[in-house]
Regions:
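Conserved serine/cysteine hydrolase catalytic core
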Residues: 166-206, 215
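Conserved alpha/beta-hydrolase catalytic His-Asp/Glu region
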Residues: 126-180
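Conserved HGGG/HGGXW glycine-rich cap/lid loop of the alpha/beta-hydrolase fold
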Residues: 2-44
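Catalytic histidine-centered segment of alpha/beta-hydrolase-like enzymes
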Residues: 216-232
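Active-site loop/oxyanion-hole signature of alpha/beta-hydrolase fold enzymes
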Residues: 24, 33-72, 233
């Protein structure tokens, strides 16, 4: 098997920095590419005005790589990956959705809380504030060691698109996503994830009928920061498996 090109798509917040500990933990046959999307990590949002614009920026990164390619979407990164593949599912050989954000946006309490723009700004400032860091260390990043926890939280201050994501990702958007019947996929979740409930997996199975599921004991929401060695082992193994599944006879993807 050729080297698997693993494109890791970050969630809302600080951009690709959440994957900074991962390259050293991946085997030689899996190469990590972690682009920072427009509006995150200090990258200007520019004229991007929706999830489709983020997906277009991601597409440029993906098509520049040789095959086989696997997308790994974490949080809203999963939504951006789904948006991209909704029109071009053959761009990649597999998809890993790790605790994706996208479903139940009209019923979950956090997206509803952040409907007012002033609340979004207050939350963004609060997450990045050093004053509230002890609180977040007991909740959001409770398993992430120093100094990575502080770096991750501080990066929210530079997320120009943070608030806009709550306008762009809606229940209507999610309901309009097509089923991807031939795409090899894995839905990955941490057993101790306190940010997103694993019961949401069923909503993604509807979109990805070829998906399998994996729940990892001991993982919270950010295992790429809290335990990069274990995370690297798991995502590398999953990526290899998806590439093998994509090349199986009769899948319609073996010539991709």
């Amino acid at each position: 098997m050729s080297t698997v090109q693993l494109v890791a798509v970050h969630g809302n917040g600080g951009g690709a920095a959440r994957f900074a500990r991962l390259p050293a933990e991946l085997p030689h046959d899996v190469a990590l590419h972690a682009p920072t999307l427009p509006g995150f990590g200090g990258r200007p949002l520019g004229d991007v005005d929706g999830v489709a614009g983020l997906a277009a920026a991601l597409r440029e990164e993906v098509v520049a790589l040789p095959r086989p390619r696997v997308l790994l979407g974490h949080g809203i990164g999963g939504s951006v990956a789904l948006e991209l593949l909704s029109s071009e599912p053959d761009l990649v050989d597999g998809l890993v959705l790790h605790a994706p954000v996208g479903t139940r946006l009209d019923t979950r309490w956090f997206p509803r809380l952040l409907r007012p723009r002033w609340v979004r700004r207050a939350v963004q400032v609060g997450i990045s504030s050093p004053v509230l860091r002890p609180l977040w260390r007991r909740t959001i990043v409770r398993d992430v060691p120093a100094p990575f926890d502080a770096q991750f939280l501080a990066a929210y201050a530079d997320a120009e698109a943070f608030g806009a994501m709550f306008d762009w990702l809606t229940a209507t958007w999610f309901d309009g996503l097509p089923v991807l019947p031939d795409l090899p996929a894995t839905i990955l979740w941490g057993e101790d994830d306190r940010v997103l409930g694993a019961d949401q997996r069923a909503d993604y199975r509807r979109l990805l009928p070829r998906a399998d599921e994996r729940t990892v004991p001991g993982w919270g929401h950010f295992p790429m920061l809290s335990d990069p060695h274990a995370y690297g082992e798991v995502v590398a193994g999953v990526a290899r498996t998806l590439v093998r599944r994509a090349s199986e006879p009769g899948t319609g993807r073996e010539a991709s």
